[in-house]
């Protein structure tokens, strides 16, 4: 894995850029969330920043433009993008945790029948992210801007966390979204990346809740440390691509360009980019023959270069 050095000087001036960040509430006691931390950094660099959330910040942040928005509502998100129009930097940061870590494992019954678990996390952590990314891409293409999309994932989307199965699953999914879209959006002058925070002090995980973890030696990060990784992911450069896809060759990997398709793990005071080494290791855990078949399938279906589109003759409601 690649260790990164990121500090405020890593972020260029952002005058003339417009950013949209979801879920940026200030919480009592002076703590702030990851999204708000990213928003403050961009404001300091001269960007115009819109914060989207259900609740307005409890204290004013100079220059921050607040828009009340339920990120789980397609129409509400669409209205915001229609209003702002030209968006250069889009941060899908909204997320919620399991209300009870044991809830998925509990056998809660109603009249003797097992109750369906609360899946509101899927609406916020996955469906809202899918909608946000789609709307951001549409806006960036329509206005022909050089765009960047960054998703707040989680370390639990990289390694298993048995105490939060649904939360972890949603974070695995959004990292999968980055891997899926990175070879497509870049051709539209749009990058997509993610940041996967380990334990971070935020409104969802206040400082007092971190004390037992710190006493056990668990490393934690402040919100502004993670927020800096979000902004870096939107503006950084790279000396090679993460991987070749479809009909691309291995030589294509060596192309310099904008930071794209990458995931930064934040843990304590360290930044680690994980996707490049993960991609390099693929032959080890798939085997050469399997990987060759995967690449062949990608090449056949690579619609960027005239690939075959697979469609089913069955009605959509009959698809497995």
Swiss-Prot record:
GO molecular function: oxidoreductase activity
Keyword Cytoplasm: no
PROSITE patterns: ADH_SHORT
Any single Pfam family the record assigns to this protein: adh_short
Pathway of action: Mycotoxin biosynthesis
Documented EC number(s): 1.-.-.-
Keywords, sorted A to Z: NADP, Oxidoreductase
Catalytic residues in the record: 167, 171
InterPro entries membership: NAD(P)-bd_dom_sf, Sc_DH/Rdtase_CS, SDR_fam
Cysteine-cysteine disulfides: none
Enzyme category, top tier: oxidoreductase
Amino acids binding NADP(+): 32, 34, 55, 70, 93, 134, 167, 171, 202
Protein purpose: Short-chain dehydrogenase/reductase; part of the core atranone cluster (CAC) which products are predicted to catalyze most or all steps of mycotoxin atranone synthesis, starting from geranylgeranyl pyrophosphate (GGPP). The initial cyclization of GGPP to dolabellane is probably performed by the terpene cyclase ATR13. The Baeyer-Villiger oxidation near the end of the atranone synthesis, which converts atranones D and E to atranones F and G is predicted to be catalyzed by the monooxygenase ATR8.
Family: Belongs to the short-chain dehydrogenases/reductases (SDR) family.
Protein name: Short-chain dehydrogenase/reductase ATR7
Native source species: Stachybotrys chlorohalonatus (strain IBT 40285)
């Amino acid at each position: 894995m690649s260790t990164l050095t990121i500090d405020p000087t890593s972020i260029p001036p952002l005058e003339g850029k417009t950013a949209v960040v979801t879920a940026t509430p200030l919480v009592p006691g002076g703590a702030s969330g990851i999204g708000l931390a990213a928003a403050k950094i961009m404001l300091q660099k001269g960007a115009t920043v819109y914060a989207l959330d259900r609740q307005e910040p409890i204290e004013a942040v100079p220059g921050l433009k607040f828009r009340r928005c339920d990120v789980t509502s397609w129409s509400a998100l669409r209205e915001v993008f229609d209003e702002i129009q030209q968006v250069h930097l889009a941060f899908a940061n909204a997320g919620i945790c399991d209300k009870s870590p044991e809830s998925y494992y509990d056998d809660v019954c109603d009249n003797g029948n097992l109750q369906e678990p609360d899946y509101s996390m899927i609406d916020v952590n996955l469906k809202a992210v899918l909608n946000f990314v789609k709307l951001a891409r549409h806006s960036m293409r329509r206005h022909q801007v050089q765009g960047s999309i960054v998703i707040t994932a989680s370390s639990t989307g990289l390694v298993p966390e048995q105490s939060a199965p649904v939360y972890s699953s949603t974070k695995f999914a959004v990292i999968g979204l980055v891997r899926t879209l990175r070879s497509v959006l870049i051709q539209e002058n749009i990058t997509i990346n993610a940041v996967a925070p380990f334990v971070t002090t935020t409104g969802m995980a206040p400082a007092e809740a971190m004390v037992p973890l710190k006493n056990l030696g668990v490393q934690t990060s402040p919100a502004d440390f993670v927020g800096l990784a979000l902004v870096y992911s939107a503006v950084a450069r790279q000396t090679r691509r993460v991987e070749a896809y479809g009909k691309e060759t291995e030589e294509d990997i060596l192309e310099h360009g904008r930071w794209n398709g990458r995931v930064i793990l934040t843990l304590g005071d360290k930044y680690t980019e994980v996707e490049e080494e993960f991609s390099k290791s693929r032959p080890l855990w798939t085997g050469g023959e399997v990987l060759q078949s995967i690449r062949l399938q990608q090449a056949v279906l690579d619609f960027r270069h005239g690939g075959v589109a697979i469609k089913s003759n069955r009605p959509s409601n009959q698809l497995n």
